[in-house]
Amino acid sequence: MNDGTDYRALLLADTPLIDVRAPIEFEQGAMPGAINLPLMMDDERAAVGTCYKRQGADAALALGHRLVCGDIRQQRLEAWKAAYQRFPNGYLCCARGGQRSHIVQRWLQETGIDCPLIEGGYKALRQTAIQATWQLAQKPILLIGGCTGSGKTQLVRQQPNGVDLEGLARHRGSSFGRTLKPQLSQASFENKLAVELLKINARQTLKRWVLEDEGRTIGANHLPECLRERMVQAPIAVVEDPFSLRLERLREEYFIRMHHDFTHAYGDEAGWQAYSEYLHHGLFAIRRRLGLQRFAELTDTLDRALAEQLSSGSTDGHMAWLVPLLNEYYDPMYRYQLEKKAANIVFRGTWQDVANWLKAQ
């Protein structure tokens, strides 16, 4: 049986992982493509851990077998068998490649299934991901900057060497940036980023990365420090599109698309409520920076815009609060941040100008 030790190759191949750690461990950090089919649930793992501390390894192992026996053992075994049949190139994975993955491997062998496991477990894959990010972050980086609504993310996605950090983080960076998909844990985000870097690097002779000019955090996720340090020093190409064009991009992204996504996911009534709460939450998140009086004024305008959209389908009313929000908050904030990096700016132009400039590099 070929147990896995070529960790980079396993990550590059999107190898399916049958992760037998407890749910709480999986939620704290997992590899892309892993499915969680625990040998022990959280309470069972906690009981075994307590037993180990008080009575030693043999007693803990015996308790584990008592907790996972009979119908419970059979149900979990059937789930592992089904997962292996679905992913015949999959590997078993536990925390460190120890007891749990070996026990599941042995139980599967007793049914005639030879499923390899990851030697060193999740910890070995995690260390490989951290090392890969550090190594690949040493390559040159070019940042795409510009005010909100400049189409930076779209531009990055079009580059063969572009890394969509916001897509990986499941967040678009601003107070209105959340999507319908919950953000990953910090470790899972870092793992996903590492795999993306490895894949792009393997596809081509890479001169440099193209990334969006991000802050330290994207929603609840923060960029790995090794990458952040390189981005602070990187050259920047700045997109400067007309204000009207930026407004249309934001209309499409935040009002039309998000309304569609919420209603598609939850139905018309619940979807509308979720969409309305999403916009209110985005404004509420920056209330102190706006000042409470201005926040109250913009909230009233938002309420009127939502009423108009609900009755007529028109998103025009949203411009009455979006325009001042850009003029008074987002644009001054970004321009202030950009001024501090003025020495790093290597090109300015419209979205198309920057796209053409990138092709010529």
Curated annotation (Swiss-Prot):
Residue ranges of every copy of the Rhodanese domain listed in the record: 11-134
EC number: 2.9.1.3
One term of GO molecular function: tRNA 2-selenouridine synthase activity
Record's keyword annotation contains Nucleotidyltransferase: no
Keywords: Selenium, Transferase
Reactions catalysed, as given in the entry: 5-methylaminomethyl-2-thiouridine(34) in tRNA + selenophosphate + (2E)-geranyl diphosphate + H2O + H(+) = 5-methylaminomethyl-2-selenouridine(34) in tRNA + (2E)-thiogeraniol + phosphate + diphosphate; 5-methylaminomethyl-2-thiouridine(34) in tRNA + (2E)-geranyl diphosphate = 5-methylaminomethyl-S-(2E)-geranyl-thiouridine(34) in tRNA + diphosphate; 5-methylaminomethyl-S-(2E)-geranyl-thiouridine(34) in tRNA + selenophosphate + H(+) = 5-methylaminomethyl-2-(Se-phospho)selenouridine(34) in tRNA + (2E)-thiogeraniol; 5-methylaminomethyl-2-(Se-phospho)selenouridine(34) in tRNA + H2O = 5-methylaminomethyl-2-selenouridine(34) in tRNA + phosphate
Listed NCBIfam families: PRK11784.1-1 (NF008749), PRK11784.1-3 (NF008751), tRNA_sel_U_synt (TIGR03167)
Function comment: Involved in the post-transcriptional modification of the uridine at the wobble position (U34) of tRNA(Lys), tRNA(Glu) and tRNA(Gln). Catalyzes the conversion of 2-thiouridine (S2U-RNA) to 2-selenouridine (Se2U-RNA). Acts in a two-step process involving geranylation of 2-thiouridine (S2U) to S-geranyl-2-thiouridine (geS2U) and subsequent selenation of the latter derivative to 2-selenouridine (Se2U) in the tRNA chain.
Name the UniProt record assigns to this protein: tRNA 2-selenouridine synthase
